[in-house]
Swiss-Prot record:
UniProt GO cellular component terms: external side of plasma membrane; plasma membrane
Subunit structure: Interacts with adapter YWHAE; this interaction promotes ER-to-Golgi transport of GPR15.
Principal cellular location given in the protein's record: membrane
Pfam families for the chain: 7tm_1
Bilayer-spanning residue ranges: 34-54, 70-90, 121-141, 150-170, 193-213, 240-260, 285-305
This protein's name: G-protein coupled receptor 15
Annotated source species: Chlorocebus aethiops
Extracellular side: 1-33, 91-120, 171-192, 261-284
Length: 360
């Protein structure tokens, strides 16, 4: 395989490639120059406002802070940093792929997108593990689920994400084609393709498997508790519903784009390409907006499904309602689940020990 003929998209944005065939494909997609600027402006406005309110509400909320809130604040900060770059891509789409803001912002904005993607996936994975420990292993996890541990984990995630984004700075460049500037990906060598494949597997698909595994274990534990109690516990049923909504939102946001990226890398490593570059480029171009929209929907998901965050946001926006209670209980759904399942697990352990002692 000739390295000079290898040109697939490797970054987390479907920017116009120097490859003329891909550039032609990009220009033939009718909605990009009209729909995407409008869509990204809406994502920018709602996302910046939503994440700012979410960070402010949780940071300045009086009283003790939940452990999960530390991860949520960092996730909102990651989304906010990415959203700041969206106006640059709005200008790019409106100008039919031309990059008019210089080489520094070409590299810098692509780097921030890569850091955001890695940071978001790792934070969501940690949040899933934290929820798994809180609900499935409430007693054993007490020594791990501490505030200082959460801060160390978040700092490590930021450091690792910044390191993983560094290849983007080297692979992105401002390219002149017919005297027109394009922020594009350099032609990929086989070695770079292999590195991209390994990085994609370990920074997306492995965390994705961890997230799905954690939530499946949580759902199974909740179902076992529901069957054991024999009661129609609305909070437990709602919690199971929320779990699948969170997983579904993550899958819809990132799986199509990263699957297209995976196929593009595998196709580039093969002697004979089974997937035409135009089809792969179109797949990433269509699925890219779904991935980026995830940065603006998270605050709304938390507001709708987390009563604790809903109260914090309302109190932040309307201090006059500070003493007004927006629910019958001040505890979060996780608190209810932790207490209920802790009792359930203790009962299970007691039953096992009793059966074991009887059998002996």
């Amino acid at each position: 395989m000739d390295p000079e003929e290898t040109s697939v998209y490797l970054d987390y944005y479907y920017a116009t490639s120097p490859n003329p065939d891909i550039r032609e494909t990009h220009s033939h997609v009718p909605y990009t120059s009209v729909f995407l600027p409008v869509f990204y402006i809406a994502v920018f406005l709602t996302g910046v406002l939503g994440n700012l309110v979410l960070m402010g509400a949780l940071h300045f909320k009086p009283g003790s802070r939940r452990l999960i809130d530390i991860f949520i604040i960092n996730l909102a900060a990651s989304d906010f940093i990415f959203l700041v770059t969206l106006p640059l891509w709005v200008d790019k789409e409106a100008s039919l792929g031309l990059w008019r803001t210089g080489s520094f912002l070409c590299k810098g904005s692509s780097y921030m997108i890569s850091v955001n993607m890695h940071c978001s996936v790792f934070l969501l994975t940690c949040m899933s593990v934290d929820r798994y420990l809180a609900i499935v292993c409430p007693v054993v996890s007490r020594k791990f689920r501490r505030t200082d541990c959460a801060y160390v984990v978040c700092a490590s995630i930021w450091f690792i994400s910044c390191l993983l984004g560094l290849p983007t700075l080297l692979s992105r460049e401002l390219t002149l084609i017919d005297d027109k500037p394009y922020c594009a990906e350099k032609k990929a060598t086989p070695l770079k393709l292999i590195w991209s494949l390994v990085a994609l597997i370990f920074t997306f698909f492995v965390p994705l498997l961890s997230i799905v595994t954690c939530y499946c274990r949580i759902a199974r534990k909740l179902c076992a508790h529901y069957q054991q109690s024999g009661k129609h516990n609305k909070k437990l049923k709602k919690s199971i519903k929320i779990i699948f909504i969170v997983v579904a939102a993550f899958l819809v946001s990132w799986l199509p784009f990263n699957t297209s990226k995976l196929l593009a890398i595998v196709s580039g490593l093969q002697q004979e390409r089974y997937f035409p570059s135009a089809i792969l480029q179109l797949g990433m171009e269509v699925s890219g907006p779904l991935a980026f929209a995830n940065s603006c929907v998270n605050p709304f998901i938390y507001y709708i499904f987390d009563s604790y965050i809903r109260r914090a946001i309302v109190h932040c926006l309307c201090p006059c309602l500070k003493n007004y209670d927006f629910g019958s209980s001040t505890e979060t759904s996780d608190s209810h689940l932790t207490k209920a399942l802790s009792t359930f697990i203790h009962a299970e352990d007691f039953t096992r020990r009793r059966k074991r002692s009887v059998s002996l």
